[in-house]
């Protein structure tokens, strides 16, 4: 039911905090497990978000050439990234409260009873 691309950033930060270091394909798979969406996250969204996080110095990357096969870019969280994740946690706590209120109101049937009263 739709993509919440805005939340790719905090999920990436959390995954990197938990894993320490990770590469693109592994992050994409982890996003699917942790994301706030029922759809797949597009690769372009992942890499755009990683670039932005790196430009803002929330993550760093380097090329891993030690493993067999082609070199892979490996990402890691910085201290600034940890602080940014904490900020996201505070924002998401407020969003969660708002969502709970929304769900409660939307599922209470209050709209139909209000509509019926106002149409009389």
Spell out what each predicted region is:
Residues 47-51:
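Short, hydrophobic-biased segments on the C-terminal half of alpha helices
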Residues 2-45:
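N-terminal helix-turn-helix DNA-binding core of bacterial DNA-binding proteins
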Residues 67, 71-89:
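Basic, amphipathic "hinge/linker" alpha-helix immediately C-terminal to the N-terminal HTH DNA-binding motif
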Residues 57:
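Glycine-centered, phosphate/nucleic-acid-interacting loop/turn motifs that mediate DNA/RNA or nucleotide
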Residues 61:
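Short beta-strand "wing" residues that participate in macromolecule-binding interfaces
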Residues 83-120:
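Amphipathic alpha-helical dimerization/coiled-coil segments
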Residues 1-7, 71, 88, 95-98:
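Intrinsically disordered, low-complexity serine/threonine- and proline-rich regulatory segments
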